[in-house]
Amino acid sequence: MNQLRLEPIKKVSGTINIPGSKSISNRALLLATLASGTTTLTNLLDSDDIRYMLASLKQLGVSYRLSNNNTVCELDGLAGPLNAGEPQTLFLGNAGTAMRPLCAALTLGQGQFTLTGEPRMEERPIGDLVDALRQLGAEVSYLKNEGFPPLNITSTGLNGGNVEIAGDLSSQFLTALLMVAPLAKGDVNIKIKGELVSKPYIDITLALMAQFGVEVQNNDYASFVIKAGQRYVSPGKVLVEGDASSASYFLAAGAIQGGEVKVTGVGKLSIQGDVKFADVLEQMGADIEWGDDYIIARQAKLKAVDLDMNHIPDAAMTIATAALFATGTTRIRNIYNWRIKETDRLAAMATELRKVGAIVDEGHDYISVTPPAKLNTAAIDTYNDHRMAMCFSMMAFADCGITINEPECTSKTFPDYFNQFNALAN
């Protein structure tokens, strides 16, 4: 087993240019594929999830050219759906941002497709999306367990019509449905059942669809209307914003042990909801400064918060470890969907926080964290979850340091994370 020892860090300062957003990268690749014209994507994220998407697109006949560092991609659109003359099996690792949108997109054209992934992918639900696609006439079947990948898709195009989709588990299901709806054979009316989680991720989807020339009528997130006969048209260039969830670790570092840490690539003009993480740090007492495309965090005495963080579920994980350096009990609420991510993040976070001495209350959809008088070092298990590894790097700001098991799991979104993190200490 690989282990990384982080010795105590007394002070951090510097500037970090954040790698491209995973959410935006994979959405933009799919829209560029369905669009007419050639799209140049810059600041594309170079990570596992994006590689799975690119490999699948290539297998399905999509032509693209990548720069040497894999962050610029020039992709020739198909001006319509993906088709396959022969049955295709696509392996998507543990990339939810590839599995869900591709599952929907492959129902638009003609062909036979099998979607598979790593063992954890077979535990991540997709039933709500499949149910919605079936309401529009798609033929999708489960190869193992009902409601979970692997999947078989026999596609003959998607009908228009009325469709209901659950909103309370993952916004990725709605994102997938929205992106394919314009290419259905008739108007699509989507009604959301229950409360829609992670609304800001839907805003990312709608903003990108608009960039590619498609209009969606959003009725206060309770329903959406997508008119038929629309076509995606390449805007020519798409700049992928820095990943706001990835920015959260560096901003927290500045708040806990700054100096001054500046992250570039995200800011006031960002379309990602996770930039609101900086507002939470500010509520905890941090000194935050906003620019159009940067955010600066400076150290301050941090105090606990009690907040609903449904709108920033990924970045909220960073608050759980930042709470170790705040006075009082921090409570993070309405985060049930942590349980269906790369691992059951609620259970994993509770287990690992207790290792360093925190008093933790783990509920069905919340976690509360009270720091001990003195933090102790531990070997942190990462559960093959990139965010667990990055969150617990904050323990380097304790007098005891920390050991991270299997640190290479950050390759899912941020292969270079620990090099960048250590650079701030020097």
Swiss-Prot record:
Binding positions (phosphoenolpyruvate): K22, G96, R124, Q172, R345, R387, K412
CDD domains, per the entry: EPSP_synthase
Any one GO biological process: chorismate biosynthetic process
Subcellular location: Cytoplasm
Key word Cytoplasm present: yes
Domain of life: Bacteria
Pathway the protein acts in: Metabolic intermediate biosynthesis; chorismate biosynthesis; chorismate from D-erythrose 4-phosphate and phosphoenolpyruvate: step 6/7
Amino-acid positions noted as binding 3-phosphoshikimate in the UniProt annotation, renumbered to this chain: K22, S23, R27, S170, S171, Q172, S198, D314, N337, K341
Enzyme Commission designation: 2.5.1.19
Pfam families reported in the protein's UniProt record: EPSP_synthase (PF00275)
Alphabetized UniProt keyword annotations: Amino-acid biosynthesis, Aromatic amino acid biosynthesis, Cytoplasm, Transferase
Subunit structure, interactors included: Monomer.
Family: Belongs to the EPSP synthase family.
Protein name: 3-phosphoshikimate 1-carboxyvinyltransferase
Natural source organism: Shewanella halifaxensis (strain HAW-EB4)
